[in-house]
From Swiss-Prot:
Keyword Nuclease on entry: yes
Record protein name field: Endonuclease IV
EC number: 3.1.21.9
Keywords, sorted A to Z: Endonuclease, Hydrolase, Nuclease
Source taxon at top rank: Viruses
Record lineage: Viruses, Duplodnaviria, Heunggongvirae, Uroviricota, Caudoviricetes
GO molecular function, one term: endonuclease activity
Reaction it catalyzes: Endonucleolytic cleavage of the 5' phosphodiester bond of deoxycytidine in single-stranded DNA
Described purpose of this protein according to its UniProt entry: Cleaves single-stranded DNA in a dC-specific manner. The cleavage occurs exclusively at the 5'-proximal position (dC1) within a dCs tract having a minimal size of 6 bases. These specific cleavages may have a detrimental effect on the replication of host dC-containing DNA.
Amino acid sequence: MQKTNPGLQRLFQIPTFTLSNSDLTCEMKVKIADTARYSLKQNPNQDKAEVIERCRIAVYAEFFVADWLSGYVNKGQEDVDDPYTYAWDVLAHPKYCGLRVEVKTHQTDSRWISVTTGCSGEYPYGSGINLGPILNHQVADCIIIFNTKEIHPGVIQYTPKFIGDREDLRKVVRKSNYNGWYLSI
């Protein structure tokens, strides 16, 4: 089926872009701090500096996508019992059909993008990008995954690697010969 949704069509046009620390706004910094705090609360054994860096890279991608779709970033009060409060990252402007977009970043040097749905769902017990929010909860309408690469100290390049809906995503997930799942793209 040909995808004709204006929001999805707009996402397909998203360019490669870069982030420098000087591009961060106060709003982004608040979301980075909140996201890092939540992650560390879930798993206190993580390295705080690594968590903040991971969140910085991910949050900037969310804000770029929100700007691209003339929408806004989900920054409400997440309620773990209500996926409508957390299982999407960006809400597009009505001219882009109000798409709810899940934004993910592949932040390793690995050629393969490992994926999982957590402890349950279609692709359980792996590691890598968590597809649970889009596949298990079915709140987000589509997903965009960026490859990220540090091109200079403090400067990250984002390249769109996958854009699609749940149906498109399921077509590219493969079982690894070793452990878990990966995207065949």
